[in-house]
Design a protein with these regions (language model features):
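Short Cys/His-rich "knuckle" micro-motifs
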Residues: 282-286, 299
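Catalytic phosphate/nucleotide-handling subdomain of diverse soluble enzymes
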Residues: 29, 41, 45-53, 117-137, ...
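Catalytic alpha/beta core of large soluble enzyme barrels
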Residues: 79-82, 92-99, 104-248
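Short Cys/His-rich micro-motifs in 6-15 aa windows
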Residues: 292-299
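Short, flexible, mixed-charge glycine/proline-rich loop motifs
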Residues: 260-268, 279-283
Length: 299
């Protein structure tokens, strides 16, 4: 790391404790994500997390000292500190200070939550189910439905065959009212001293006026920031020279373009496989790559 980075880490000692699986937890408790009961419950969890982490940071400061940039008066007068600590924690901080300038953050936890089979961060579950395709070397790929782990477990325990029969506690990112989503983020923000990673998903027919109302509602609920994603939107570069064409190419047209590009690559370098870069072996008027099995004779 650069000297400036080392100095910043040493002077501030920032860490980012967080949460994962909130939506799964609410389902197991029988609470609908975004309901007032769920928001009140998360409010209590957030306070407990903040108070406990501040207390532990004070105890670490007792043993190892405060972070170099610690300013006692600023911390003790901070509205965040006052609202998120018990009397006992306030006394510990007043006596020993804090080891860390930053303690809590809500990371997206996208990869690890998928790996562990739980919902990410403070997000609602994304989908009840999705379709997975398994490709084979023979004709006919296999398509099958895969359920989100929490939904699959619930359906097995309660002998439910169709996801339509699940109770209304199984709200998803697309079925959840954006106001309930914003209220949930707002209550967590009260207890997080850093940042929150989250996305509000809205349907493709969401209008410009509705987007304006969404941002206004987020502002009214004191959110520091909000990210939305409208279903079906395509990403493009920030700068474009020409207006993109709405015409989509057929599979046959794309395959023809690919074949032409492959043959052109072989023409320029007949000894290198255009697919994997391996060596092409020539025999019987044709050639084949022994690494990936590609042969131009099969085009």
């Amino acid at each position: 790391p650069l000297k400036e980075q080392r100095d910043t880490v040493r002077d501030l000692r920032q860490i980012g404790l967080g949460v994962m699986g909130i939506a799964d937890m609410l389902i197991k408790l029988g609470l609908k994500y975004g309901s007032q009961e769920s928001i009140d419950f998360c409010d209590k969890i957030g306070f407990m997390m903040a108070d406990a982490s501040i207390m532990q940071s004070a105890l670490l400061a007792k043993e190892y000292g405060v972070f170099p940039n610690y300013k006692k008066e600023c911390v003790l007068k901070s509205p965040y500190f006052i609202k998120n600590t018990t009397v006992q924690t306030k006394r510990l901080v007043e006596e020993y200070g804090l080891r860390n300038s930053q303690l809590l953050t809500i990371a997206p936890t996208g990869s690890i939550s998928t790996m562990l089979g739980v919902s990410g961060g403070i997000e609602p579950i994304f989908m009840i189910s999705y379709t997975r395709k398994t490709e084979t070397l023979h004709d006919g790929d296999t398509y099958y439905k895969v359920y989100t782990p929490i939904a699959k477990t619930y359906m097995e325990i309660n002998n439910i065959d169709k996801e339509e029969d699940l109770p209304d506690i199984f709200v998803t990112a697309m079925s959840l009212d954006y106001k309930d989503r914003i209220k949930m983020q707002s209550v967590w923000q009260k207890h997080i001293d850093a940042s929150i990673s989250s996305t509000v998903n809205v349907p493709n027919n969401f209008t410009i006026e509705q987007v304006e109302d969404l941002y206004k509602f987020a502002w009214e609920n004191n959110l520091k920031g909000i990210t939305i994603y409208r279903d079906g939107c395509e990403r493009t570069g920030i700068l474009t020279a020409n207006k993109p064409s709405n015409k989509k190419k057929t599979v046959e047209e794309l395959q023809e373009e690919l074949n032409e590009a492959v043959l052109e690559a072989l023409k320029n370098n007949p000894n290198e496989c255009p697919m994997c870069g391996g060596e092409m072996f020539h025999s019987g008027g044709c050639s084949e790559c022994h690494d990936c099995g590609y042969s131009p004779c099969s085009i």
